[in-house]
UniProtKB/Swiss-Prot annotation:
It is an enzyme of class 6 (ligase). InterPro entries: Cyt_trans-like (IPR004821), Pantoate_ligase (IPR003721), Pantoate_ligase_C (IPR042176), Rossmann-like_a/b/a_fold (IPR014729). It catalyses: (R)-pantoate + beta-alanine + ATP = (R)-pantothenate + AMP + diphosphate + H(+). It comes from Mesorhizobium japonicum (strain LMG 29417 / CECT 9101 / MAFF 303099) (Mesorhizobium loti (strain MAFF 303099)). Belongs to the pantothenate synthetase family. Its EC number is 6.3.2.1. This is Pantothenate synthetase. The reaction proceeds by a bi uni uni bi ping pong mechanism. Pfam families: Pantoate_ligase. The lineage of its organism: Bacteria, Pseudomonadati, Pseudomonadota, Alphaproteobacteria, Hyphomicrobiales. It comes from the Bacteria. GO terms for molecular function: ATP binding; pantoate-beta-alanine ligase activity. It is found in: Cytoplasm.
Amino acid sequence: MSRPEVVNSVAALRAQVSDWRRDGLRVAMVPTMGALHEGHLSLIRIAREKAERCVVSIFVNPTQFAPSEDLDKYPRQLARDLDLLARVKADLAFTPTVGAMYPAGFATRISVGGPSAGLESDFRPTFFEGVATVVAKLFLQATPDCAVFGEKDYQQLCVVRQLCRDLDLPVEIIGAPTIRDAHGLAMSSRNAYLDEAELAVARRLNVILHKAAAALAAGTHQDDATGEANRALIAAGFQKIDYVEARESLTLAPWRRDRAGRVLAAAWLGKTRLIDNVDVPVA
């Protein structure tokens, strides 16, 4: 299996996409920060089903990290990533430098309202501004017909959809199911930070969220269901809970019982912050 072609300039990216367009080919994109795992590969497989050509960006975006977060520690392993991209037959890897994405004098930020309110934004107030800005740039650079994002980062998926609607970006946003290990833990590049004991605790997160979702579907009051989930997470060994909340699936507005919903959570194990979400069936 051969590795995909690698380009690190916007000009080279646009030239390749233009060649595909001249041949009448549909183009999909999967934005990533590298440190690829099976969750990412599942997104690329979906992209390959939706289009004849697939661009995967690998860029650790500094604007979505707060000063106290793990930008410097975030795993960077391009050679391994390219080998994995070969397995799923990605056509092009776009690996820009920070200087190429944010050259001297760069002064624009995109702020998305609506689904960005609360949840992650309460604890990472600059995160979605960084996400929206880099995603808009990537879409303008690659001009994909569609892009695939995982439901594991559910609020991010909703924010990207809002971004494309509001700015008339002609990109179809495809949400992909969360990929989990055999014990139900959502796959994440940050799982590599966990030791064996922490992994055992981390695998309780999905179980506890499913119990909360089932309780909500059965008629339990929101505060009772999410409060019990908070207590269960602490009892399981999580040191701190940032949030456990029920929101409407489409808008992330506060959940109403007659609407499809999601239970979303963020919790800490040592220095590692984990997020996950599960759906709440309509009653």
